[in-house]
């Protein structure tokens, strides 16, 4: 890819079990965020597996991206921030970490389809952090 050019791809995270700050510049996956045209991140505050995500590290108390959303969005450039959409799916998914709950949720699948397959159709813009 030539300098200044960026491959065009989109990312959707359902129930993301990743530290909620790892996508920020300078962090573990900090180079990923600028690479995608669109990001859709779901948040579920009732997900029992994500609520216990802190158990993955013995000496630290991380929070899952799928539980809290991306923290530190205020540290991103306006252009990066505009490509991120976060949606709260707590009322749709509830107290489960089961992938089927996402697959059989028409609103989630519909939004995922729009973001991944038809950019620009039904765009709501970046949700508030």
Residue ranges and their predicted role:
Residues 2-129:
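Lipolytic serine-hydrolase domain surface
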């Amino acid at each position: 890819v030539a300098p200044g050019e960026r491959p065009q791809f989109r990312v959707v995270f359902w129930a993301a079990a990743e530290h909620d700050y790892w996508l920020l510049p300078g962090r573990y996956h900090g180079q990923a965020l600028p690479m995608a045209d669109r990001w859709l991140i779901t948040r579920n505050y009732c997900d029992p597996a994500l609520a216990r995500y802190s158990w993955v590290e013995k000496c630290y108390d991380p929070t899952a991206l799928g539980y809290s959303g991306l923290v530190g969005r205020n540290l991103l450039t306006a252009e990066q921030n505009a490509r991120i959409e976060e949606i709260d799916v707590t009322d749709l998914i509830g107290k489960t970490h089961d992938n089927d709950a996402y697959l059989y949720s028409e609103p989630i699948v519909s939004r995922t389809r729009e973001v991944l397959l038809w950019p620009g159709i039904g765009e709501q813009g970046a949700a508030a952090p």
